[in-house]
Swiss-Prot record:
Gene encoding the protein: CHAF1A
Keyword Chaperone applies: yes
Pfam families: CAF1-p150_C2, CAF1-p150_N, CAF1A_acidic, CAF1A_dimeriz
Protein's name according to its UniProt entry: Chromatin assembly factor 1 subunit A
Binds to PCNA: annotated segments: 1-49
Family the entry assigns: Belongs to the CHAF1A family.
The organism of origin for this protein: Bos taurus (Bovine)
């Protein structure tokens, strides 16, 4: 890039001025050309990118490129000012280091004033030098046209090239504008205040101050512009920017002499010149970089030099800046070195930028690769998880399918097996039923062979015709259908009815007609035998039911079942021939007190019988008495399950098929039992003669009779009936509760033990009506043997309460729980104790038991004495209904003082071995003489009579003594 020498005017590179401007003669003396070395464009990148790179790498270059370009134009403008306004004495003495050589140069410049300025474009190749003046004229014309555009003269060529004014206004000021704004005169104070101006803040002035710069410019012709172009104030030849140099010696100085320049503003020495070189080179490098971009902003555009091709209006002299060859050569070398340094710096910056971009690119690529790898891993993981899930679902489905198929096969096999078993079972059942029917028929024939029944004539069966939607009605023997119309049809009545329907008279009252009418009457339906076939033509007569084969059924009537679901007592199945006149269909809830006693609750008096012992021990017994008579008697035994269907017991399962199967199984078991040879023993009468008191050999007979000893309860006089019969039950409950309180309160045993103990005490007469506990008279309870029982009565008060009644009284008046006083035991309610004045009862209770209690409970109570040797284990003498017993059926017996020896009882036989349970059904009484009434039982009376019981003629078996 070429640049004209600068003078000492204020500017960005004002310190680097190494020349002094002087007035020269009008004639040209010598051509003086200052040029810079050609440069090579380093990078053809847009201006914005170069500026950004420079701003990033070189932080010290704070000034914009536009300011440097303005400074360059300002320096050129100052140079022109120096040409026009310099006023220096041309004396041979040294002024600022200038001597006679300067005068010689001045004289050479004056002689060559009329010569044209030669323009050398160092940016072009060395093979194309400007050897003629055509290029010079063209450049001058271009420069003049650019200057005219700046000063307001319209540029036709610019308009023809399509550069609108609006674009020129929008852009920043071009280099020509910067040159026009610089004032032509330099002031002395410009150097002092040039600090800010040299950094880019240039002084501005009107373009009229420099008429020489604007008036001598000329326009290029269109024909001379081949290969040249202008964009943004920069000249291009082809694609290369061109800098136009002006001959600084051809310009005439102005008429007036310039003010004296102080020595500080003169041409600097060689030592000062290198200091200004970096800024100058920096500005040049910036302008060189920005000149390659035609579309860059005006800040980075290179500044073309103003050219003056016309003759100078001042012919007298031309200002000349003296530049020594040494200074020019040193400046060129320094500029070259600076240019190289700039290139190296720019290369390093570009390299650093490229490395940074490469690193950033590598980092982005690494990050992208990492993200892609992560996504790929996630996709692979999801794919694997999906495959695993699908595989697991598939396995589960296969497993479920296999299980289903296996279950289906198992069900098929099970169904096939069940079908086979069912078929086999049906065959066996059919076979067994046939055998059962045969056996039952044989038994019935055996039973009913003694009773010959007259054969009743069988009613004829008539089959009725079709009766439409209704099925045929089955009619049995001695049954006829009622006639459809019992009265004869009267035509007069029919006509009267039709007349009334047609008239619809409101005077006639149907209510009055109903009151006046008499109901029709008709006798029983009697159908003659001759009309039987006609009237019963649509009736099917089935076979009459068979008459029950049970004898004397007609005499006693039909069997009846009385059963209630809330009762514990089994249902009643039997005959009921009593009739009442109180209970009628119109009054079904009436009470016939003459027939029934509504105060007695038979359900409470009922007691469950103890389960019998097993008969398995009698399997090995030898039966020597089995003979032909047993075979004959077997026919009279009713088989198990026979005539027991729906009798007395409510079946849990209402399925009739299961019920029949159950009955068949029971019958089969009964058949097997009979097939094994098991037979019931026939009861043999036992004859026991008189037993004398002195007879010691009668111990066995005495022991047998002693089992039926009667125990008489205390006779209680009946209370006066002041309350109705409805309160008798409540009074009895209160009496039982008063006697039960000492045993119940604080007792650790269960309700069964308490009930058994209380019943035993009641049987022995140990409980008095007035006494609340048996401690008063039964501190050591006597055994039932030596005690003299009192004669019982048939009153309800002396009867032994039932288990259900005692259990209800216990549950209503006490609770079994654990309290702080004692552990788990029975506690009577406080209000009950208070009502009976028994709050002082101890816990645990201090009752003396007469029955056996569990060992653990006996130890826990701590107050139960061990039974003495004379007391022994009491024999259970339970009675089911003592009030209904007849004591006259028992006979008197007497015992002596000695102990009865054990004898052989093999000759006494019974149907079962439940003697302990059934021996309470009978009572043996000791009836002494009149004089021995007060004597205890078992002592020898003074009369010494012999008392015996003769059972040879009339034997009373234990079964006959059973009371129900």
């Amino acid at each position: 890039m070429l640049e004209e020498p600068e003078c000492g005017a204020p500017g960005a590179r004002g310190e680097a001025a190494a020349m002094d401007c002087k007035d020269r003669p009008a004639f040209p003396v010598k051509k003086l050309i200052q040029a810079r070395l050609p440069f090579k464009r380093l990078n053809l990148v847009p201006k914005e990118k170069i500026d950004d790179g420079l701003d990033d790498t070189g932080g010290s270059r704070a000034g914009p490129v536009q300011t440097q370009l303005h400074n360059l134009e300002t320096s050129l403008d100052h140079l022109e000012n120096c040409h026009m306004g310099s006023d220096i004495d041309f004396r041979p003495k040294l002024v600022n280091g200038k001597g006679p050589l300067d005068n010689f140069l001045r004289s050479q410049v004056e002689t060559s004033i009329g010569q044209a300025v030669v323009i050398i474009d160092l940016t072009e190749d060395s093979s194309n030098p400007p050897d003629n003046m055509v290029g010079h004229n063209k450049l001058n014309s271009a420069a003049s046209s650019a200057q005219k555009n700046i000063n307001g003269v319209p540029d036709k060529a610019g308009d023809d090239r399509g550069l609108p004014k609006a674009r020129q206004k929008d852009e920043l000021a071009s280099p020509e504008e910067a040159l026009s704004e610089v004032p032509c005169k330099t002031e002395a104070g410009g150097a002092d205040s040039g600090g800010a101006d040299r950094r880019g803040l240039t002084q501005r002035g009107s373009p009229q101050n420099c008429p020489k710069l604007t008036g001598d410019l000329s326009m290029w012709s269109e024909k001379d512009r081949d290969g040249w172009s202008e964009a943004g104030g920069i000249l291009f030849k082809g694609k290369m920017p061109v800098v136009v140099l002006q001959d600084i010696l051809a310009l005439r100085p102005p008429a007036r002499s310039p003010p004296a320049t102080p020595p500080s503003q003169a041409v600097p020495s060689e030592s000062e010149t290198p200091e200004s070189s970096p800024e100058e080179d920096l500005a040049l490098s910036h302008s060189s970089l920005s000149s390659s971009s035609p579309t860059s902003s005006p800040e980075g555009q290179s500044v073309p030099t103003k050219l003056h091709t016309g003759p100078s209006p001042f012919p007298a002299s031309t200002p000349v800046c003296r530049i020594t060859k040494k200074l020019v050569r040193g400046s060129a070398e320094k500029n070259k070195m600076k240019l190289q340094r700039d290139k190296e710096r720019l290369r390093r910056q570009l390299k650093l930028r490229a490395e940074k971009e490469e690193k950033e690119k590598l980092r982005e690529e690494a990050k992208r690769a990492k993200e892609e790898a992560r996504k790929k891993r996630e996709e692979e993981k999801e794919l694997k998880e999906k495959e695993r899930r699908e595989k697991r679902e598939k396995d589960e489905k296969e497993k479920a399918e296999k299980q289903r198929l296996k279950e289906e096969r198992r069900k098929e096999r099970q169904e096939a097996l069940e079908a086979k078993l069912e078929e086999k079972r049906k065959k066996e059942e059919e076979k067994r039923l046939r055998e059962e029917e045969k056996r039952i028929k044989a038994e019935k024939a055996e039973i009913t062979r003694f009773f010959q029944k007259p054969k009743t004539p069988q009613a004829p069966k008539t089959l009725a015709g079709s009766c439409g939607k209704f099925a045929p009605f089955e009619i049995k023997e001695h049954m006829v259908l009622a006639p459809r119309c019992r009265t004869a049809f009267d035509q007069d009545l029919c006509d009267q009815l039709d007349q009334l329907l047609q008239q619809q008279s409101s005077e006639f009252s149907f209510l009055q007609d109903l009151k006046s009418r008499r109901p029709l009457r008709s006798g029983p339906t009697v159908v003659s035998n001759r009309n039987t076939d006609l009237s019963n033509s649509d009736v099917v007569i089935v076979e009459s039911s068979k008459v029950d084969g049970v004898p004397e059924r007609r005499k006693f009537g039909r069997m009846k079942l009385l059963q209630f679901s809330e009762n514990h007592r089994p249902a009643y199945w039997g005959t009921w021939n009593k009739k009442t006149t109180v209970i009628r269909p119109r009054d079904p809830w009436a009470q016939d007190r003459d027939l029934l006693d509504y105060e007695v609750d038979s359900d409470e008096e009922w007691e469950e019988e103890e389960p019998g012992e097993s008969l398995s021990h009698s399997e090995g017994d030898d039966d020597d008495d089995v003979g032909e008579d047993e075979d004959e008697d077997d026919g009279f035994f009713v088989p198990h399950g026979y005539l027991s269907e729906d009798e007395g017991v409510t079946e849990e399962c209402a399925d009739p098929e299961n019920h029949k199967v159950r009955q068949k199984l029971k019958a089969k078991e009964w058949d097997e039992f009979l097939a094994k040879g098991k037979r019931f023993r026939i009861l043999q009468p036992v004859k026991i003669g008189c037993i004398w008191a002195a007879d010691k050999d009668g111990g066995a007979d005495l022991k047998v009779l002693q089992q039926f000893t009667a125990c008489l309860l205390e006779t209680v006089p009946p209370e006066e009936e002041q309350t109705p019969k409805a309160s008798k039950r409540e009074k009895r409950d209160q009496q039982i509760l008063a006697q039960l309180l000492p045993l119940l309160h604080g007792n650790v045993n269960g309700s069964k033990v308490i009930i058994r103990e209380f019943q035993e005490c009641c049987r022995r007469g140990l409980l008095s009506r007035d006494a609340g506990s048996p401690e008063d008279s039964a501190a050591s309870p006597p055994s039932p043997g030596p005690a003299r029982p009192q004669t019982p009565t048939a009153s309800e008060d002396v009867a032994v309460p039932s288990k259900a009644r005692l259990k209800r009284i216990i549950s209503e008046n006490s609770v079994y729980e654990k309290r702080p006083d004692f552990r788990m035991c029975w506690y009577v309610h406080p209000q009950v104790l208070k009502s009976f004045a028994q709050e002082h009862l101890p816990v645990p209770c201090q009752w003396s038991y007469v029955t056996a209690v569990p060992s653990a409970t006996r130890e826990d109570s701590g107050s139960v004495p061990a039974p003495g040797p004379g007391q022994g284990m009491p024999v259970s003498l339970k009675r089911k209904s003592a009030g209904s017993m007849c004591i006259t059926q028992f006979m008197k017996k007497r015992r002596h003082d000695g102990q009865v020896g054990t004898g052989d009882l093999d000759d006494f036989q019974a149907d079962t071995e439940e003697e302990d349970d059934d021996e309470g059904d009978c009572v043996i009484m000791d009836i002494s003489d009149v004089g021995d009434i007060q004597a205890p039982c078992g002592t020898t009376s003074g009369a010494g009579g012999s008392v015996g019981m003769d059972t040879s003629e009339s034997f009373v078996s234990p079964s006959s003594l059973r009371l129900s």
